[in-house]
Amino acid sequence: MKRPGRWHVRDPEYVLQEQKKGIKPMEANNENPIIQLVGLGKQFQTMNGPVTALEDINLEIRYGEVFGIIGLSGAGKSTLVRCINYLEVPTSGKVVFEGKNLSVMKDREKRLARQSMGMIFQQFNLLSQRNVLQNVCFPLEIAGVSKAEAKKRAEELLTLVGLEVRMKAYPAQLSGGQKQRVAIARAMATNPKVLLCDEATSALDPNTTKSILELLKKINREMGITVIVITHEMAVIEAICDRVAIIDHSHIAEVGNVSDIFSGPKSDIGRQLILGDVAEQNLSFGNSRQIRIIFDGRESSEPVIANMVLACKVPVNIMHADTRDIEGKAMGQMIIQLPEDDTDAGRICNYLKTANVKFEEVR
């Protein structure tokens, strides 16, 4: 098979042939991050004075990974992603893309760097007077690609995202999920190395969200594109991301592998995002002590609680439990109410420690 040119999508058949030859898609690289944010800050000037949206942000995003940025509304996550591709110019610090500081680049260099970063949004931003094929061709037209080559590239991408039979449809004739697939194809038109996703699934129903996340994961794995996901939903992070940064009040609260953050969040905002409304719901149970037990795959297939009750001869009240698929393994959490008697509570905690089951006291 002929090697794809500049505007050709890396289709699964081509990737398979590369793998047979020992050539692998771009993988996460610890030593050479594709994006570095160093002391990044952003202020907006208002009539009432400056407002700080970001302060002293330091992050490294590796080649070929799916990196999540999560936070509550107003935390600064959307401003952060817009600073990465210079839709917003940082007030301080620097953005380093493939070893080069964007702030000192000449306009042409900066434009080429930005073409290497595709972006999709919550509201799709499709051109209503253009059909699906024309929407995907649009960035290629701006880049000076010939109409024939742009059409060929757009058709390849629309086939990749599963819309080959909807190329002549207009945005008003599409569902929300189909519109986002068009937006993804358009963002990939210039063959980017990074795909920025700003709340890309927030306006979609759960089933459509799942299909879009599966598509993003497919693009990452088969084409080696680094994907950066901005969201306020922990379920999105757990479904697709390798690592995550939690942003709170304009600062990075913590960064780590998704499974590590789930197992042992170090920040209050991390615990809040993982537990969701569970902590608030449990306030109705009075002042009793509660612990959160974390199951990491091994324990999720064993009767840990049943064995604990039999061994300690102490009944417990299960207040919440759920399981999740994180990084390809079953993980879960359970919040139980400890007995009021300190001796009984101590026996339960000692049993869990002996059994090497992770837990933390949540109140």
PLM features: residue spans?
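ABC ATPase NBD coupling module
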Residues: 48-51, 102-118, 147-148, 261-265
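Helix-to-loop junction immediately C-terminal to a conserved catalytic motif
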Residues: 85
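Conserved ABC ATPase "signature" region
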Residues: 100-101, 137, 141, 148-165
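Short coil-to-helix segment of the ABC ATPase nucleotide-binding domain corresponding to the Q-loop/switch region
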Residues: 130-137
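Conserved signature/switch motifs of ABC ATPase nucleotide-binding domains
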Residues: 169-172, 190, 197
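ABC ATPase "signature
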Residues: 255-256, 264
